[in-house]
Amino acid sequence: MFLFDWFWNVLSFLGLYNKNAKILFLGLDNAGKTTLLGVLKDGRLSSYLPTFHPTSEELAMGNIRFKAFDLGGHESARRLWKDYYPSVDAIVYLIDSSAQDRFVESKKELDSLLSSDELANVPFLILGNKVDIGNTSEEKFRASLGLTQTTGKGKTTLNGVRPIEVFMCSVVKRYGYAEGFRWLANYL
C-alpha cells in the first residue's frame, strides 16, 4: 500500500491535484484493463470475467479525481469506443505484450484511435502489459506497433504534437504502470 500511496502523492506533487479527468481504458480483450482499474481502485488483485458492458469508476486518490471508463476489448465492444471520445482527457491503451500473435490486431485498433479527429489532441499512454510472462523487449514491442518515435518519457512539451509514450509493465507484479501514469499526469 505504501507504493500505491506514494504514487498518488507524486501525482499530486506534479500538479495534478484538484483536477478532474475523464480517462478511457482501451485495448483488446484480455490485455489487463479491468485488472489495472481494480488495482488502482482498491489496491487488490482479483480475477475478472471478460468485460461485456462498459463500466466506470470514480477514483479519488490523494487530491486527484478522475472518472475511468473500462469499455471492454472484444470485437463487438470496440464498436462502442467512439461513443466515449467526446470530452475525454486521456487514453490508456493496454496491450498484452506476451500475445505477439495479436500485435497486428492491436496495432490496427491503435492506429484507428490515433487517426480519429476527436482524439487528435488527447494524450495516449500505451502500456505493454504482462512483461512478467512474455519475452518481448520494449524495442520489439514499439517496432511491432510502429511507435519508434514517441514524445519521450520526460516532461516534454512539443507544440502541435500529441503526447504519446510506451511503458512496459506488469499489473499483476505491480510495476511499470506507475511511471506511465506519472508521465500522463504531465499532460492532463
UniProtKB/Swiss-Prot annotation:
Its main location: endoplasmic reticulum. It is an enzyme of class 3 (hydrolase). One of its GO terms (molecular function) is metal ion binding. The keyword DNA-binding does not apply. The keyword Membrane applies. Small GTPases activation is mediated by guanine exchange factors (GEF), while inactivation through hydrolysis of the bound GTP is stimulated by GTPase activating proteins (GAP). The lineage of its organism: Eukaryota, Amoebozoa, Evosea, Eumycetozoa, Dictyostelia. Small GTPase that cycles between an active GTP-bound and an inactive GDP-bound state and mainly functions in vesicle-mediated endoplasmic reticulum (ER) to Golgi transport. The active GTP-bound form inserts into the endoplasmic reticulum membrane where it recruits the remainder of the coat protein complex II/COPII. The coat protein complex II assembling and polymerizing on endoplasmic reticulum membrane is responsible for both the sorting of cargos and the deformation and budding of membranes into vesicles destined to the Golgi. Keywords: Cytoplasm, Endoplasmic reticulum, ER-Golgi transport, Golgi apparatus, GTP-binding, Hydrolase, Magnesium, Membrane, Metal-binding, Nucleotide-binding, Protein transport, Transport. SMART domains: ARF, SAR. It is found in: Endoplasmic reticulum membrane; Golgi apparatus, Golgi stack membrane; Cytoplasm, Cytosol. A motif (STAR) lies at residues 2-4. InterPro entries: P-loop_NTPase (IPR027417), Small_GTP-bd (IPR005225), Small_GTPase_ARF/SAR (IPR006689), Small_GTPase_SAR1 (IPR006687). GO terms for cellular component: COPII vesicle coat; cytosol; endoplasmic reticulum exit site; endoplasmic reticulum membrane; Golgi cisterna membrane; phagocytic vesicle. Belongs to the small GTPase superfamily. SAR1 family. GDP binds at residues 30-35, 129-130, 132, 171. This is Small COPII coat GTPase SAR1A. Pfam families: Arf. Its EC number is 3.6.5.2. GTP binds at residues 30, 32-35, 129-130, 132, 171. Residues 10-14 are annotated as: Mediates recruitment to ER membranes. It is a peripheral membrane protein. GO terms for biological process: endoplasmic reticulum to Golgi vesicle-mediated transport; intracellular protein transport; membrane organization; regulation of COPII vesicle coating; vesicle organization. PROSITE patterns: SAR1. It catalyses: GTP + H2O = GDP + phosphate + H(+). Mg(2+) binds at residues 29, 70. Homodimer; upon association with membrane. Part of the coat protein complex II/COPII, composed of SEC23/24 and SEC13/31 heterodimers, that it helps recruit and assemble on endoplasmic reticulum (ER) membranes at ER exit sites.
